[in-house]
Amino acid sequence: PLSITEIAYSKDTKNVILGWNSIPGAAYIIKYSTDLVNWDNDLDDGITSDGDTTSRTFTLSDFGLDSLPMVFFRVERDDTN
């Protein structure tokens, strides 16, 4: 099953690294929520897997998320691509 296998955060750079198990050639969407209820916001979509595992780095300030006390992430398979 799809699951996040790596989460790393740097306070200095405001970067978060997300890694997950993936299927070669599949596409994925990374979504975020501030309340675990609303998952309408994408960090990125149409991410093509890197193979059996995939990871991406995001700068939270690029999305206005660096000042929030908590942010939650999830990865979904993008079956539209």
Question: Model-derived features: where do they sit?
Answer:
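Short, composition-biased motifs enriched in small/polar/acidic residues
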Residues: P1-N81
